[in-house]
Every structure is written in structure tokens, then in C-alpha cells.
Amino acid sequence: MKKFLRFIFRIISIFYPYWLHQKLVFVKDACYSMWIRNFLGKVGERSTICYPCQLQGGGQKNIYIGNNTTIQASSILGCWTQYGQQQFPNASIKIGDNCSIGEFNHITSCDKIIIGNGVLTGRYVLISDNNHGGLSAEELDINPINRELKSKGGIVIGDNVWLGDKVSVLTGVHIGKNTIVAANAVVTTDLPDNCMAAGVPAKIVKKLS
């Protein structure tokens, strides 16, 4: 049975080669981008939003994407203008030109997130300017999903920043231009221009000249 199935799929691969699959994925993502851009504030020229992309928070019109930027598949863009009884009318996400946002990224804002030009992110990156409640005894007795959103301020990521796989950038952080953040790091404080950071919490491990 196993040999038979291998034979069948070998035949299928002749009529449906991988290059054709890639072409069809390209067409699918182009069509999907033309559809989903109608729900956002602005999507620039030659930008692609790959299928699927989940929009959360009700503030889709406050999401702006620059030119020649790609949002890879299975990403989540959450712009929370309302969460329960809370109102965040100025919540926004702005992504610059020539960026590549990796697969399974989660970008969530109730304040503001600004991502500069030429930014590269790996897979499973979290960029969040908010969290669910604090650490008081009263809040801990509430289910996390029902706690109020709290933010220490917006996030700014400078031009040409590279965030490795599974990096988390948390509320109130500013990352300077040309900075590299190693995989699995958790950024809780500001990072200057031209440095490499790693660890939990992220610390500067090298200055880049």
C-alpha cells in the first residue's frame, strides 16, 4: 500500500511540479492582498499580505503598511480600538517600506506600534505594546482574558532592525536603527542604534560599527 501511494504521488508530482505550486501560491497571495487591503487604513504599492492574515481588535483602519512590504502567512495584526468596556481610539500599527514580516508573527497594539523601513522579522515574533492586567491580588482572581489591557507606552522599531525567530518585543520599548536581536530574546527595555542584543531579558552583547 505504501509503495502504491508513493507511486501515485510521484505521478501527481509530474503533472503538478513544485514550481507550479509556487506560482499558484503567488497568485493566491496576490488576490488575497487585493481583497484584504480594503479593510486596512492603507497598503502601499507592491506590498503583499499572504494568506491567511487575521485582523483583530476592530481598528483595522488604523493599520498602515508601506511600499514593497510583505506580511508572511499566518500573521496576526491586532489593533485594539476597543477591548470589553475599554476604548483605545488612537491605537495604531504603522509598518514602513521594504519590510519582511515573518510567518506566524503577532503584532498587537492598544497604543501605537511604529515599525521603520527595511525591518526583517523571523518566524513567531511577538510585538505587543500591551498586556492583560497587572499582578495585584484582585486582578489575579480574574480570568486573564477578562482583565483590562494595560500599556506602558507604544513601541518604536527603527530602520533596518532584524528580529530573529521567536523574539518578543514588549510594551514601551524603542529599538534603534540597524540593531539585531537574537532568536528567542525578550526585549523589555530600550536598545540603541547599531547593536546586537540577546537573552531574557535582552541585553547588549555587541556594538556594531
Task: Outline where the language-model segments fall.
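Domain-scale signature associated with acetyltransferase and cell-envelope carbohydrate enzymes
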Residues: 1-129, 155-159, 167, 177, ...
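Short, flexible, mixed-charge acidic loops at enzyme active sites
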Residues: 133-143
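A short acidic, glycine-rich active-site loop
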Residues: 89, 142-155
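Active-site nucleotide-sugar/metal-binding loop of Leloir-type enzymes
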Residues: 189
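Conserved beta-strand->loop/alpha-helix structural units within folded catalytic cores of enzymes
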Residues: 165, 170-171
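Active-site/ligand-binding-proximal alpha/beta "capping" segment
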Residues: 174
